């Protein structure tokens, strides 16, 4: 059984706010990991379905950068949204980076790509 995906963040509060605001994820728990001087937070959709997103913040991390897209080992997260244009409009108002405007993936599916505050690529999916 697939349990969770973990991504790093440079600012825990900002990331929790981002995923809560735009994807309605709710904070399940936060934990201090003393051995690695880190904090982790688990978020999940409001209905408690789907896999969990783990955010990891290392306090002693001096530098936080994303490599060029072609050099990344992790590709992207994906979230289904009810109305892709309305979602992107709200994201634009919050200065979210939109990397690919909406386009038809197939006759029933429209997708777009954005970045979270730390540059993690996120696919938005609208299914009709």
PLM region descriptions:
Residues 1, 69-74, 105-106:
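Short glycine-enriched loop/turn motifs at secondary-structure junctions
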Residues 8-50:
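Core segments of cupin and vicinal oxygen chelate
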Residues 42, 79, 88-128:
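Vicinal oxygen chelate
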Residues 46-50, 60-62, 84:
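Short, charged/polar surface micro-motifs in flexible loops or helix N-caps
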Residues 57-61, 126-128:
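Acetyl-CoA-dependent GNAT
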């Amino acid at each position: 059984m697939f349990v969770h995906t973990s991504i790093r963040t440079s600012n825990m509060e900002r990331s929790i706010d981002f995923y809560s605001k735009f994807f309605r994820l709710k904070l399940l728990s936060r934990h201090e990991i003393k051995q690695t001087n880190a904090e982790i937070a688990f978020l999940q959709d409001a209905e408690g379905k789907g896999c969990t997103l783990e955010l990891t913040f290392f306090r002693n991390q001096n530098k936080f950068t994303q490599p060029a897209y072609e050099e990344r080992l992790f590709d992207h997260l994906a979230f289904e949204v009810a109305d892709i244009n309305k979602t992107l409009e709200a994201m634009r108002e919050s200065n979210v980076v939109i990397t690919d405007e909406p386009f038809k993936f197939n006759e029933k599916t429209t997708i777009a790509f954005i970045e979270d505050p730390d540059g993690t690529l996120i696919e938005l999916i609208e299914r009709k």
